[in-house]
Amino acid sequence: MPYIGASNLSEHSFVNLKEKHAITHKGTSSSVASLQTPPSPDQENHIDNELENYDTSLSDVSTPNKKEGDEFEQSLRDTFASFRKTKPPPPLDFEQPRLPSTASSSVDSTVSSPLTDEDIKELEFLPNESTHSYSYNPLSPNSLAVRLRILKRSLEIIIQNPSMLLEPTPDDLPPLKEFAGRRSSLPRTSASANHLMNRNKSQIWNTTSATLNAFVNNTSSSSAASSALSNKKPGTPVFPNLDPTHSQTFHRANSLAYLPSILPEQDPLLKHNNSLFRGDYGNNISPERPSFRQPFKDQTSNLRNSSLLNERAYQEDETFLPHHGPSMDLLNEQRANLKSLLNLLNETLEKNTSERASDLHMISLFNLNKLMLGDPKKNNSERDKRTEKLKKILLDSLAEPFFEHYNFIGDNPIADTDELKEEIDEFTGSGDTTAITDIRPQQDYGRILRTFTSTKNSAPQAIFTCSQEDPWQFRAANDLACLVFGISQNAIRALTLMDLIHTDSRNFVLHKLLSTEGQEMVFTGEIIGIVQPETLSSSKVVWASFWAKRKNGLLVCVFEKVPCDYVDVLLNLDDFGAENIVDKCELLSDGPTLSSSSTLSLPKMASSPTGSKLEYSLERKILEKSYTKPTSTENRNGDENQLDGDSHSEPSLSSSPVRSKKSVKFANDIKDVKSISQSLAKLMDDVRNGVVFDPDDDLLPMPIKVCNHINETRYFTLNHLSYNIPCAVSSTVLEDELKLKIHSLPYQAGLFIVDSHTLDIVSSNKSILKNMFGYHFAELVGKSITEIIPSFPKFLQFINDKYPALDITLHKNKGLVLTEHFFRKIQAEIMGDRKSFYTSVGIDGLHRDGCEIKIDFQLRVMNSKVILLWVTHSRDVVFEEYNTNPSQLKMLKESELSLMSSASSSASSSKKSSSRISTGTLKDMSNLSTYEDLAHRTNKLKYEIGDDSRAHSQSTLSEQEQVPLENDKDSGEMMLADPEMKHKLELARIYSRDKSQFVKEGNFKVDENLIISKISLSPSTESLADSKSSGKGLSPLEEEKLIDENATENGLAGSPKDEDGIIMTNKRGNQPVSTFLRTPEKNIGAQKHVKKFSDFVSLQKMGEGAYGKVNLCIHKKNRYIVVIKMIFKERILVDTWVRDRKLGTIPSEIQIMATLNKKPHENILRLLDFFEDDDYYYIETPVHGETGCIDLFDLIEFKTNMTEFEAKLIFKQVVAGIKHLHDQGIVHRDIKDENVIVDSKGFVKIIDFGSAAYVKSGPFDVFVGTIDYAAPEVLGGNPYEGQPQDIWAIGILLYTVVFKENPFYNIDEILEGDLKFNNAEEVSEDCIELIKSILNRCVPKRPTIDDINNDKWLVI
């Protein structure tokens, strides 16, 4: 589901209205010291009253039996009694006065009133204006991130508290009925005994409740991460043993609205494990967290008891557990399973690697028959039972409703607690519900999708601008467009839009362009075939979603490659029977089968019951294929993930023989189109029999009539396994045959906006509506959602009857999220078979042709009038490497490269190549028409680059990567003899796993004095961190030279040096100790063919992107630790290669970094050395921060209480770094939050110079990255100079740091939208004025970097 929220204004007014309303309730005025004193009689009476209300609210809740219900009720009373008797914990620092919440003049947007025509008009265009409103990519962040992060946090809690795993889990599904009113019970059940601290033996918990209870109270959001008892004063830490900021996985944090049911299971071990919750987490409760939407209050109170998170948070969970026997074996196995799943989630969410697409997709389809934890080949019934219980726990966590208020993470606890109190009173029937309905409504629908977005977890998008008229000549493109389509930057000027469209899709695209003349929106995510060089020599089609809009005389196009299965069917022209079927994707077949006797089962028009044997066998096959270990790296990278459909790796199943059904055999089995698609066959029969006809049909022969009607209808369903799947069909009449090209998307999801009262569809994404349900937008807008989800009203009615607290029309439920698995669970309850939830494959949706398809949907309450549905259709597939990009090396001609020198000044280095390229050769350079002629040069160029690299390189990538990373870690840690170094690296590893720990006060603190001292250094002097003068009269450069000479004499060249530049050795003599390398090599690149990656041991994977990956490594011999960036040679854009007089033919990134080394700057990452082999360039850079670092994207996400002064210090360093670049005649061209890293002291480094260029090389046609940071003149297709565009980007960066969201969300807003500021934000006027001046669309009026550096807001 996308991160969809309401506007800043409406959200803030909602907070203040809640606060104002809740203050009128009783029991909210107790003092802060109430935690340290026993409850007053009035407070005790209030607790008793709340318990009475709770009893009433749960009077109709079904429990397993009466005894259990009595135990549950008694446990609540006992825990409240224990709360009264409990000795309070040591007091925290609450001396500082609390700042009052600032009232807002804006009004609440949740007031119930009919949707006006203006509302409907505005909402109608939203789902089609942005590429964030649809997704065909299982890796897309707007698909699963919210659900997976809930699951991730649950896993972390179970792993850190392994005693939970010893509790037996009942086989029966806890009925959702027990969740009724749980929002009101949340504070009482979880906080009554300070969570787990004072639990007594009468308390009843199960794994799910303990896990999610911890998760709820460990999430800092409005619903569950503030003061919990309604009678406590705001800010009182009722959970001193848990840190509410510990699980800030996203600044749009989620909070579970309801805890799972509490079942009668004892926990004998947890009582020994209290220190887990009293440890380092306990002292980190902040008495005041500034509002996320008011992030820059004058906050003077700091934590005094905070301490540095250490390994105990991750290791102490074993302290009090049995260390031998069956119990320990069980724990070890279960924890290993959970850690395996957690690692998978972390890697997929953080690094967005396409190799994990199948795994992520499987989690999105998660049910009991999926996601095998462990080796599926082992037949262990006990293990299977435990795994099944574990999966049930995870499923239950995915089904939990939660609230998501984007402004509430890190919010003022006053607003948090008062809102919670109001909702408790409303749930239980107490309190005063005064005039909330007489407030004038105000909507800002335009900001539904404008929440904080970034490219960090986004799939690569190719962006073009071209002319609006035929032939649609390209004007500009981004670098990813060159990478995706395999073209050079110079070739763009000679290409047209149709050159990139596959011949099978050109008619469709051309018709769409012509039929939408005069309209702004042209494409809204339609699926088309595109051209890549590899597709010219193969029949394999590459598919992409296509979004396009006319703006300012240009057509702006966005392509994103997507997984798509397709099949070609040739029909004879006599009886339209199937003559030949080419099914390389095995869309119509069932692929490898477990039994040679298996046959394809064709479903009926309606979906067959779920959980069929055939479906389960497919799931089993997929899982076994996923867990089949490749025999070598080549097999893993080559066979399983090959884009070419001619080669498929078959899973080696030890238990059963495997038979692959090839398309040629399958084609002989299918003669009737009805076997492929009943709805398609019916249309063809109706046309042939005259039931369906057009006025012009009488003049046309039958094949053309059939072809025209198929193309007009286009969207059908295929008979696929146990249920139907949607598809699109295009037809072409050939000489003797009718060709059908059928394509079907294994994953698609999109936004639907629905009136919550009438359930009419207000708007939806047009492409998703067609591809998933077969309807055109005009056919369904304004009609009921039951047209496509027939059971939707039944679900809502059931929820309103059984769980009235979840009524989507209630004011208080704004921000309520009902997940996909929640509706699966509701469906199971309606069916009277709660266990079926665990094997559910989705909800029935209705296609236009009358066939049922399986879908899932997530519901979000925008306000009491509008709900947002994120509807998903997905099926079980193992995604191949659909995102493979063609090699750029085929286009490289060294004779045409610019000649530069890293040793000279920027002026001479920026000389452009004098050779001009004729227009006639540009087509050849595009590689679209001469693939065969250029292909043979690939290997030759690959080995020629860098002067005899093949002869000198002593290892290949496959040899290096055969050593597993875990073994690398073990051997690397053996080299770390220094305990302090081990400790630092372990902290860095912990922080990389859980970035919320990095930004805690105990670790992260912006050091003002350090930053000011660094900024004040002259850029021309050597970095103090790298080489400090020893006081002997030598300059830093002279001293470094002397040190290097001495090191060479002693055989320690390349060894690490300390802060004084002294070679660090251990007691054994010349053997160096492990340390962080800071000083560059004397002659960078001198060992580029000698040094190899196998000389290093990888300690940690740090990231992966479109062009390469990054690892933390230690040198085996010299024991120095560096960060190595590995750049794929085949993905280096042909236009970014340069010939350096000293360094040879290298990527411009290395050349520019080497040039910057001559005049280093504190805020720019230095180049230590580089080397290469056949596949990669390896760039060595210093480690930033001894305990790791975090990029600005994550800092904004997790550092929710950042002050304006801290933001100023960080931004000032960015400005200083960019100023140094501009002074050297260099433009960065890819400034964004991900390319700014920050250490634990707030010290900043600018990284990633892969797109950097010299100013004199401009003007530039190709821009870098995605739309978010692109300047309007760049999107307008105009050549740009570089520096003003860097300025625009840092303006976007500043706005993002201050307001936690991008200022512009789509192309319209970038080109002509007003710059909006939230009046409720307590941001200084000077800061706002600076942002306004930077984000000026008039390029001449945009300030220079010197103007910004001297701005009064940046004066410190």
UniProtKB/Swiss-Prot annotation:
* Single GO biological process annotation from the record: regulation of translation
Q: Which GO terms describe its molecular function?
A: ATP binding; protein kinase activity; protein serine kinase activity; protein serine/threonine kinase activity
Question: Per its UniProt record, what SMART domains does this chain match?
Answer: PAS, S_TKc
Specify the domain of life of the species encoding this protein.
Eukaryota
Gene Ontology cellular-component terms for this entry are: cytoplasm; cytosol; nucleus
Residues in PAS domain copies: 450-518, 738-807
Instruction: Name its cellular compartments.
Output: Cytoplasm
Residues where Phosphoserine is found:
10, 192, 202, 255, 286, 327, 926, 1018, 1023, 1035, 1055
Listed under catalytic activity are: L-seryl-[protein] + ATP = O-phospho-L-seryl-[protein] + ADP + H(+); L-threonyl-[protein] + ATP = O-phospho-L-threonyl-[protein] + ADP + H(+)
Enzyme class, one word? transferase
The residue ranges of the Protein kinase domain are 1096-1354
Q: Where is this region: Disordered?
A: 20-115, 592-612, 627-660, 948-972, 1021-1066
Q: Where does ATP bind?
A: 1102-1110, 1125
What keywords sit in the KW lines?
Answer: ATP-binding, Cytoplasm, Kinase, Nucleotide-binding, Phosphoprotein, Repeat, Serine/threonine-protein kinase, Transferase, Translation regulation
Q: Where is the composition biased (Polar residues)?
A: 26-37, 54-64, 952-961, 1021-1032
Cite the EC number: 2.7.11.1
Q: Name one Pfam family in it.
A: Pkinase
- Major location category of this protein: cytoplasm
- Active site as annotated: 1230 (proton acceptor)
Q: What family classification does the UniProt entry report for this protein?
A: Belongs to the protein kinase superfamily. Ser/Thr protein kinase family.
Q: What else is known?
A: Present with 967 molecules/cell in log phase SD medium.
What is the role of the protein in this entry? Answer: Serine/threonine-protein kinase involved in the control of sugar metabolism and translation. Phosphorylates UGP1, which is required for normal glycogen and beta-(1,6)-glucan synthesis. This phosphorylation shifts glucose partitioning toward cell wall glucan synthesis at the expense of glycogen synthesis.
Q: What is this protein called in UniProt?
A: Serine/threonine-protein kinase PSK1
- Species of origin reads Saccharomyces cerevisiae (strain ATCC 204508 / S288c)
